[in-house]
């Protein structure tokens, strides 16, 4: 009886390396595939593509599997990076990792794996997949280790993708994964986890963005219309941002920090608010579009669920309702006010551990006070 062939996405990190080893131990015919999704800056200190490939080859040799590299840079720039720049240009804050998973790691990669004769693919993501015995649908669940759960980034995966996907680390705590890596003497056992957006690396984000988007200085105003400074360009700020604004405590002596509270694209104005719990930063309601549902259909109107509006956030109790426009929009009404709900980010819904899917945040209704210049007080969440 032939072994089931699985192609593992290997990045050179500990998680994907242990994933490959676990599947080999379970009797699968394992092939490693290293994806190169970004070509610029390979000679700089910020990108470690060459070293990552060396680590992949070393791990593959140790555990006894074949490995190959495939270049998806063109697909990445077309399907992910171009959208990333469009969103920032529009004053929003996108999450490219969500789009990368849906378009590259579980589409381009999946298609390539199938062309190699694979029956399934696997990655080192911390999440789980199961098939519902009652209706036969595949479900995306949070990882056993909730502190490492990555279902937020995977919420746009569909039934076809999930049916061909394995997440071996979904039931294992991160600490155990590290232990396994050391026990089997993986050459990268002590390698640090990657952080940040893959094509940016560890460089300052503003420096990277400035290479692709021009600066366009404009007024920085308080929520009541008082000019307090100048910004370098709306694309370089995100809702709720504290660092890099260039404002200290106010002259009224309150000394509370300032936060980005809104953008008006038409007048190129950046609005700032003082105090973490300022009304302009708190929202009870959001609307989202560009939806994707794991089951292929949205929840019923009035469904009580939990939602995350950013990664690592605890599920916030809320009620789901369709916007009734027929365009795939939905609204969430939260039981408690949410802080800095940011357009461009994903609102992801959960029923306990089950990830239902979600959409891209379009607008959040804040408890903002009346501005002196209401016609210019279009918040960041006004597209």
From Swiss-Prot:
CDD domains the UniProt entry points to: MnmA_TRMU-like
Any one Gene Ontology cellular component term annotated for this protein: cytoplasm
Gene3D superfamilies registered for this protein in UniProt: Adenine nucleotide alpha hydrolases-like domains (2.30.30.280), HUPs (3.40.50.620), Translation factors (2.40.30.10)
InterPro entries according to UniProt: MnmA-like, MnmA-like_C, MnmA-like_central, MnmA-like_central_sf, Rossmann-like_a/b/a_fold
Residue numbers spanned by region Interaction with tRNA: 148-150, 310-311
Cellular localization per UniProt: Cytoplasm
Family membership: Belongs to the MnmA/TRMU family.
The protein's name in its UniProt record: tRNA-specific 2-thiouridylase MnmA
Species, as recorded: Paraburkholderia phytofirmans (strain DSM 17436 / LMG 22146 / PsJN) (Burkholderia phytofirmans)
Lineage: Bacteria, Pseudomonadati, Pseudomonadota, Betaproteobacteria, Burkholderiales
């Amino acid at each position: 009886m032939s072994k089931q062939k699985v192609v593992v996405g290997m990045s050179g990190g500990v998680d994907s390396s242990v994933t490959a080893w676990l599947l080999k131990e379970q009797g699968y015919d394992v092939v490693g595939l290293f994806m190169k999704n970004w070509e610029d800056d390979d000679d700089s200190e910020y990108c470690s593509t060459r070293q990552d490939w060396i680590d992949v080859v070393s791990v593959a040799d140790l555990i006894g599997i074949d490995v190959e590299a495939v270049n998806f840079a063109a697909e990445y720039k077309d399907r992910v990076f171009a959208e990333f720049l469009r969103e920032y240009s529009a004053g929003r804050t996108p999450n490219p990792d969500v789009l990368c998973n849906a378009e590259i790691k579980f589409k381009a990669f999946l298609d390539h794996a199938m062309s190699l004769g694979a029956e399934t693919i696997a990655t080192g993501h911390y999440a789980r997949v199961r098939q519902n015995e009652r209706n036969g649908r595949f479900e995306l669940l949070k990882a056993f280790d909730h502190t490492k759960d990555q279902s937020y980034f995977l919420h746009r995966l569909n039934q076809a993708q999930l049916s061909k996907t394995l997440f071996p680390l979904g039931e294992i705590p991160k600490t155990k994964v590290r232990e396994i890596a050391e026990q089997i003497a993986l050459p990268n056992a002590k390698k640090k986890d990657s952080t940040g957006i893959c094509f940016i690396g560890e460089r300052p984000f503003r420096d990277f963005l400035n290479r692709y988007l021009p600066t366009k200085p404009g007024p920085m105003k308080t929520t009541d219309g008082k000019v307090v400074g100048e910004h370098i360009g709306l694309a370089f700020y995100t809702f709720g941002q504290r660092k890099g604004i260039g404002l200290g405590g106010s002259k009224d002596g309150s000394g509370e920090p300032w936060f980005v509270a809104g953008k008006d694209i038409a007048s190129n104005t950046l609005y700032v608010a003082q105090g973490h719990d300022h009304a302009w930063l708190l929202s009870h309601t959001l609307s989202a579009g560009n939806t994707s549902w794991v089951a292929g259909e949205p929840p019923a109107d009035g469904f009580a669920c939990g939602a995350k509006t950013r990664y690592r956030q605890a599920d916030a109790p809320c009620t789901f309702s369709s916007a009734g426009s027929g365009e795939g929009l939905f609204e969430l009404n939260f039981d408690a006010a949410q802080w800095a709900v940011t357009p461009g980010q994903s609102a992801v819904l959960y029923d306990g551990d089950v990830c239902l899917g979600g959409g891209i945040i379009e607008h959040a209704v804040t408890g903002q006070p009346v501005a002196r210049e209401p016609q210019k007080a279009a918040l960041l969440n006004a597209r």
